[in-house]
Amino acid sequence: MALWGGRFTQAADQRFKDFNDSLRFDYRLAEQDIEGSVGWSKALVSVGVLTTDEQQQLERALNELLIEVRSNPQAILQDDAEDIHSWVESKLIDKVGNLGKKLHTGRSRNDQVALDIKMWCKAQVTELQYAVRDLQAKLVETAENNQHAVMPGYTHLQRAQPISFAHWCMAYVEMLERDYSRLADAYNRMDSCPLGSGALAGTAYPVDREQLAKDLGFAFATRNSLDSVSDRDHIIELLSTASLSMVHLSRFAEDMIIFNSGEADFVELSDRVTSGSSLMPQKKNPDACELIRGKAGRVIGSLTGMMVTVKGLPLAYNKDMQEDKEGIFDALDTWHDCLTMAAFVLEDIRVNVERTREAALKGYSNATELADYLVAKGVPFRDSHHIVGETVVYAIKVHKGLEDLSIEEFRQFSDVVGEDVYPILSLQSCLDKRSAKGGVSPLRVAEAIADAKARIAAKK
């Protein structure tokens, strides 16, 4: 049943109907559409459109429909309704007859769909925060179990300075903390109810929109009807948050792929998250991580598509806005799946501590410690930097690590070097000295783990 047929003398062509109809994807808003309709029925009582008995009859029927939807949401797709609003109204009329035709009084599909998608987005934020929190918890657990696994830290994908695997894990905990915070911020900005804004100019019925907002779980009612029905900021903001978080997850996945490679051999991924080759029997491919990395582009594409869709739209509602749903549905589903899979990847990960330590000992990653040692001896840092650079060139030439050079060899470059240089050049010393807040010293890493555990516990 179309909701707009009276103006037309011909039926819509089936080709247009197939092109125009949105039930095949907006059926996912069924619960929100029904809950919004219950709220609107109560508002109509307050302005005399419905009696209390009529409202109660409508609410009972809507609640019955809600139970049916929750038990089998896919059944909606068997209908040929134009959209989820048409479907709900037709099913309501089937249950209560002509009384169901009164429910849309004073309401437009424009404010109705704006409400539905906001309610859906709010629910998704909560679920996504749980998923972010759970991945943080798994990273913290992995860090706690690998506090003594020393590995090289990288810049430009070249060995730079020693870090611990735990410190690496905690870096991603911090990225996810910002993602969690952005979700909370986005929730606060979308917590305004557009219902009662009508098509664009507001409803002609003097409903108490603040009470309506509270009934539907919002903090307050929107302030401008034009903005209310055309606002898709909350979708774009969620897509932006999802995209940035997927960038974080993609970097995590890329690190894991590198660490898992035969060349690095820092970690071994479980058989449960890897696959083989149809040709090469020896292969064990990090498919879970590669898919996370690949899906980042898909989510970012949804953000780009939505921004381009709305950038030139005049106020207020335009049918272009129907394109908001498939992108946000797919992007948030994908993000949630990737958060869950990243946590699963960490469940059975094995860190090759001997290999990571061996790699940390190579690449002259203790060169900065030697420069700091010279500074402590009174050499200006810029000079010490140059001296150590020359020393590294020499060490490479003679195939030695800095810690393997003799005092005589050191003194070819600086006569202030003494026997006390050797403890400074050890991996443990390199870690221990980085003891400022946020540093890689074991003490600071342990503090970071404890702090993160407290923050995660508070999110429950």
From Swiss-Prot:
Protein's UniProt keywords contain Cytoplasm: yes
InterPro entries for the chain: Arg_succ_lyase_C (IPR029419), Argininosuccinate_lyase (IPR009049), Fumarase/histidase_N (IPR024083), Fumarate_lyase_CS (IPR020557), Fumarate_lyase_fam (IPR000362), Fumarate_lyase_N (IPR022761), L-Aspartase-like (IPR008948)
Recorded superkingdom: Bacteria
Subcellular localization(s) per the UniProt record: Cytoplasm
The reaction(s) this protein catalyses: 2-(N(omega)-L-arginino)succinate = fumarate + L-arginine
PROSITE patterns (alphabetical): FUMARATE_LYASES
UniProt similarity note: Belongs to the lyase 1 family. Argininosuccinate lyase subfamily.
Pfam families (UniProt xref): ASL_C2, Lyase_1
Signal peptide location: none
Stored NCBIfam families: argH (TIGR00838), PRK12308.1 (NF008964)
GO CC terms: cytosol
S-S bridge residues: none
Pathway where it operates: Amino-acid biosynthesis; L-arginine biosynthesis; L-arginine from L-ornithine and carbamoyl phosphate: step 3/3
EC number of this enzyme: 4.3.2.1
Main location per the UniProt record: cytoplasm
Protein name as annotated: Argininosuccinate lyase
This protein's UniProt keywords: Amino-acid biosynthesis, Arginine biosynthesis, Cytoplasm, Lyase
